[in-house]
Regions:
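A compositional/structural signature for long, glycine/proline-rich flexible linkers
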Residues: 1-206
Length: 206
């Protein structure tokens, strides 16, 4: 009798856990349920309106997990990549180079995240309660490189480039990248294939 009474609760807890697990990282199931992995420019996934009222519960959960500000279009476009130009995962024992062109936008930047969707920290300077400034050090801002629309840029990604402007550090962790384009030209919404995503070129590996 006790088991019968508890069965609905056990089933509910089990289903809750199983429905949450796919959203602990960028997975095929999460991409399918949210639609966030179905639209791509090269290997960069995009979704043009994270802040739409029409989002389903899976999309809202995924946006919260990724820590992206759910700004409505046409304020921001987010693109994410987890593989290089060869289709290989972005791993912590290799160095990479981003080669791209400045987008038509008010502001743009790259952020690097671990596969747990958290900012990566310097293992030699870990902080239990990192400040915004600590985490923002792991962002490569467009204004550090060039503000000229259409100009080419290069960003190095390696184990520890924390003190180098216009670079990103993975500290030996597997990772994914987020390209954030704020105040984008509306032409990108009409034709997303025109979004100038960067090439992700693998360099030396240990």
């Amino acid at each position: 009798k006790l088991l019968k009474k508890l069965a609905p609760y056990l089933v509910g807890v089990t289903l809750g856990i199983l429905s949450f697990i796919p959203f602990t990282r960028q997975t095929t199931i999460a991409s399918f349920l949210t639609g966030f992995g179905s639209n791509t420019v090269n290997q960069w996934n995009y979704f043009l309106d994270y802040g739409s009222e029409s989002q389903n519960m899976w999309q809202r959960a995924y946006v919260s997990l990724l820590g992206l500000l759910p700004s409505a279009s046409p304020e921001v476009i987010y693109l994410s990549a987890s593989v290089d130009d060869n289709g290989d995962g972005l791993v912590g024992n290799c160095e990479y180079t981003l080669n791209g062109v400045v987008p038509k936008a008010r502001y743009w930047s790259y952020a690097i995240y671990g596969n747990d969707n958290y900012y990566l920290q310097d293992p030699n300077n870990l902080k239990d309660d990192p400040t915004y400034e600590d985490l923002f050090a792991q962002v490569a801002n467009g204004h550090e490189l060039t503000t000229d629309i259409g100009e080419k840029y290069e960003i190095k990604i390696g184990n520890n480039f924390i003190n180098q402007e216009g670079s990103l550090s993975h500290f030996g962790n597997d990772f994914n990248l987020i390209l954030r384009i704020y105040g984008p030209d509306l032409i990108y919404y009409d034709d997303p294939s025109l979004i100038p995503v960067a090439k992700i070129l693998k360099g030396s590996c240990k």
